[in-house]
């Protein structure tokens, strides 16, 4: 049983973050924010696959202005990602964003920081302090580890906001190195009450990035650390959302859509179990029912090994078994197994 760290609650648009609220799934658009139709279309696609928070890069005033057209067209909270220029933060707030990702120490002039905080406070808009290992301040003590530097940098940004009586704060500390990221989060989790956004940065393409993210995010979540998560991949953002839910489901922290259980195959397998499992997974991706489905490679061990599945098939040469909760309900010709399984799923 995972005991979650108790953080303060904040509101991000229509979403509660922290406290006892469910761990939220976030992604980031990969369109040019200035391309309004493309950005709206991508956000709507992400909404359909379960994304709950979307972050948009705001590189210039044209992108900030685009938010005024984007915000009314989408349902999920929008976070504007701001670097250095406080005017972009002010313009994004005026455009109606639900949150900012901003490091106040990078803005420079304290009066500019005050202007951003004043505007955010008036609108009750939270600010996420996002520290990345690759862009740490140069004046940090050299004897500190990277994780310690990340925490020190984050605490510096936090103190600026707290000094302006601003408490709608969320924090992230990301690195490519998984142990460094885990160390940074575990340190800061005991120092602050604010919600934590968890992720591993720049993990790469899905083949490697999914593994790094699952190990890093999964370890932190198992320790109870994390209120929102993002799986950062060099891939379409829908894949990030799918992966995030799989991590949450694997730890029994969230349940969205089906879980596919399939065997790794062995010499007893007499059918194309890889192809069958892939076909079933493709069909399950379009289903929201929180069920467990099994695809097993032999009729000898299949039903017993997947007895916790709501439905499943055990495939044999020429025919296979269709079963529910480990109990056989039908013998089905091999070429009809997948269709029979999908019909049973639809009837649930």
From Swiss-Prot:
It comes from the Bacteria. Its cofactor is [4Fe-4S] cluster. Gene3D superfamilies: Dihydropteroate synthase-like, Sulfite Reductase Hemoprotein, domain 1. Its EC number is 1.17.7.3. InterPro entries: Dihydropteroate_synth-like_sf, IspG_bac, IspG_bac-typ, NO2/SO3_Rdtase_4Fe4S_sf, RibuloseP-bd_barrel. Binds 1 [4Fe-4S] cluster. The keyword Iron applies. GO terms for molecular function: 4 iron, 4 sulfur cluster binding; 4-hydroxy-3-methylbut-2-en-1-yl diphosphate synthase activity (ferredoxin); 4-hydroxy-3-methylbut-2-enyl-diphosphate synthase activity (flavodoxin); iron ion binding. The keyword 4Fe-4S applies. It catalyses: (2E)-4-hydroxy-3-methylbut-2-enyl diphosphate + oxidized [flavodoxin] + H2O + 2 H(+) = 2-C-methyl-D-erythritol 2,4-cyclic diphosphate + reduced [flavodoxin]. Pfam families: GcpE. Pathway: Isoprenoid biosynthesis; isopentenyl diphosphate biosynthesis via DXP pathway; isopentenyl diphosphate from 1-deoxy-D-xylulose 5-phosphate: step 5/6. GO terms for biological process: isopentenyl diphosphate biosynthetic process, methylerythritol 4-phosphate pathway; terpenoid biosynthetic process. Signal peptide: none annotated. Keywords: 4Fe-4S, Iron, Iron-sulfur, Isoprene biosynthesis, Metal-binding, Oxidoreductase. [4Fe-4S] cluster binds at residues 263, 266, 298, 305. Belongs to the IspG family. NCBIfam families: ispG_gcpE, PRK00366.1. Converts 2C-methyl-D-erythritol 2,4-cyclodiphosphate (ME-2,4cPP) into 1-hydroxy-2-methyl-2-(E)-butenyl 4-diphosphate. This is 4-hydroxy-3-methylbut-2-en-1-yl diphosphate synthase (flavodoxin). It comes from Dehalococcoides mccartyi (strain CBDB1).
